[in-house]
UniProtKB/Swiss-Prot annotation:
UniProt-listed InterPro entries: P-loop_NTPase (IPR027417), Zot_N (IPR008900)
Keyword Cell division: no
Residue ranges of coiled coil: none
Subunit structure: Interacts with G4P; this interaction results in a complex that spans the inner an outer host membranes.
Keywords noted in UniProt: ATP-binding, Host membrane, Membrane, Nucleotide-binding, Transmembrane, Transmembrane helix, Viral extrusion, Viral release from host cell
Role according to the record: Isoform G1P plays an essential role in phage assembly. It is required to increase the number of adhesion zones between the inner and outer membranes of the host cell. The extrusion of neo-synthesized phages occurs at these adhesion sites. May be involved with G4P in creating zone through which the phage assembled and extruded. Isoform G11P is also involved in phage assembly, probably playing a structural role in the formation of the phage assembly site.
Gene Ontology molecular functions: ATP binding
Family (UniProt): Belongs to the inovirus G1P protein family.
Record protein name field: Gene 1 protein
GO biological process, alphabetically ordered: viral extrusion
Subcellular localization: Host membrane
Length: 365
């Protein structure tokens, strides 16, 4: 069994953190008992179509009879399936000032046996010191210290921005729950709960006033969201979205719509033209590269004017050397390796061919 005492200043997000744990328990199919006014259809992980949400709303300031009426939270020995009991504003009815209240001890005794009944407990209170000392020593297994990021200030940077702009540096509204093992602020940190919480604001009554009048806040079990909202909800199929689209189009200014469509058409035209220009430019660049390569290859194939320098034959092997005007020697075997075809008619008549290039070579040059 886990018992958490959630503490924090006013507006620090204590109830929000507890409601997030309630949502987690309901999503797993567990049982929840609480003195909070919940709006089950606004839980994102539950939704308005859930048919089996087991929630019990007990009195604002519960007595032993209220706690006994919720029964067992888990019938198995698997503690991960325990139910969750959430009690808010414990500082008004579970505080150290009312230590002489005769109904206090039976409630503490029940909480001590909550593990055997299959319940995890979350007490919500402004400060752990406000809690009854006997209950604090016996039950405060984990203490959660809640903080809000948007109420903090970044050192140096926040001060500079405040001086320059006249306002605080806006930080995101993120809620932190630092879980300590024990009621000492220096105890070991065992977990950290982080929530933005914006999707849970509508899931509970943030302005709920707790009273001891049982006629105003009697115990009851709320119906599952399907029977209060889901069964009356409009089915969100394709027809629904088409109808909503038509309604929004009618509500919007026709001149604005026409301007939007004209702007969209102009943007599409500019994009099409830019793509066509880009493709044309790429085509021109490719053609220029091809022409340069072909000219380079063609110039590389042209040989200077040659004349036969020597001719030798041994059996079927014929070797011919050529020379140009600068007396540079070219061997027939080297020309063949470079891709030229050497046709030898006789010792004074040789033809060199490569693609469209042809040169007739004789002994006179």
């Amino acid at each position: 069994m886990a018992v958490y005492v959630v503490t924090g200043k006013l507006g620090a997000g204590k109830t929000l953190v507890a409601v997030s744990r309630i949502q987690r328990t309901l999503a797993k199919g567990g049982i929840v008992a609480t003195n909070l006014n919940l709006k089950l259809h606004h839980f994102p992980q539950v939704g308005r179509y859930a048919k089996q949400c087991r929630v019990m709303r007990i009195a604002d300031k519960p007595t032993l009879e209220d706690l006994e009426s919720i029964g067992r939270g888990n019938l198995t020995y698997d503690e991960s399936k325990n139910g969750l009991l959430v009690l808010d504003e414990c500082g008004t009815w579970f505080n150290s000032r009312n230590w002489s209240d005769k109904s206090r001890q039976p409630v503490i005794d029940w909480c001590l046996h909550a593990r055997k009944l299959g319940w995890d407990i979350i007490f919500i209170i402004q400060d752990i010191s406000l809690m009854d000392k006997q209950a604090r020593d016996a039950l405060a297994e984990h203490v959660v210290y809640c903080r809000r990021l948007d109420k903090l200030n970044i050192p140096i940077i926040g001060g500079l921005i405040s001086v320059l702009s006249g306002g605080r540096l806006p930080l995101p509204k993120v809620h932190f729950g630092i879980v300590k093992y024990g009621d000492n602020p220096q105890s070991l940190t065992v977990d950290k709960w982080v929530y933005t919480g914006t999707d849970l604001y509508a899931a509970y009554d943030t302005k709920q006033i707790f009273t001891s009048d049982r006629e105003i806040s009697p115990p009851y079990c709320p119906l599952s969201p399907y029977y209060t909202h889901g069964i009356f909800s409009v089915k969100r199929d394709a027809k629904y979205y088409m109808r909503m689209t038509k309604i929004y189009f009618k509500k919007m200014n026709r001149v604005f719509l026409m301007a939007s469509f004209l702007a969209l058409g102009a943007a599409c035209g500019i994009f099409y033209k830019s793509q066509a220009y880009s493709n044309q430019l790429q085509h021109i660049q490719d053609n220029s590269k091809t022409s340069v390569i072909s000219k380079t290859d063609q110039s590389a194939e042209i040989l200077p004017r040659l004349s036969i320098n020597s001719y030798s034959q041994m059996g079927y092997d014929v070797s011919v050397t050529f020379k140009d005007a600068k007396a540079k020697i070219y061997n027939s075997f080297d020309l063949i390796k470079d891709g030229y075809r050497v046709d030898i008619k006789d010792a004074c008549h040789v033809t060199i061919v490569k693609k469209s290039y042809i040169q007739q070579i004789t002994c006179e040059g």
